[in-house]
Amino acid sequence: MAEPAEPAPHLIVTGERVALGPLREDLVPVYARWITTLEVARGLGNTIIFTVEAEKGWYEQAAKPDPGQAHFLIYDRFDLEPIGTTGLINIDHRHGTATFGIMLGERRGQGLGTETTRLVLDWAFTVLGLHNVDLMVFAWNKSAIRCYEKAGFREIGRRRGGAVCMGRRFDVVIMDAIAEEFTGSVLSGLVPG
């Protein structure tokens, strides 16, 4: 007898090559594996080895209904494999601001991060009605900076020497995107108007 097929994941936002859905508790060990790879840890500035138990604590906090955060699981749209997590934190509805974050655990360097970033910005501006989304990235991470620029972020400043990575000091680049400059919304057609 054949194994029952795994149910299709719940997708909230679908782009051309990626889709966003809710975080899944069954993937906590995968999240822990992603965040402890050297490339991801270096990009996030982590010096801590995350255990499955520690990542479960993050998941439990991130999965709580909270108007101050919106977390997503990133899927490859074609094979529906989870490839990372993304979201907004510090959402301030009064001032219309939030901070963006992304962790691609799989399939980096294929433009999927750029599309994911655009989808989250679209969610922020179109669904949440925010005005400004910011992020911070290490200056040495040129590929991430290019990704963010392609998605609509612009550099607005630097914290000079604000980070140490592998014994060397680097600037932290501060970037933001604003609703008025965001183009190419895939969600705007869904908003009644």
Feature locations, PLM:
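GNAT-family acyltransferases
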Residues: 1-107, 169-170, 177-193
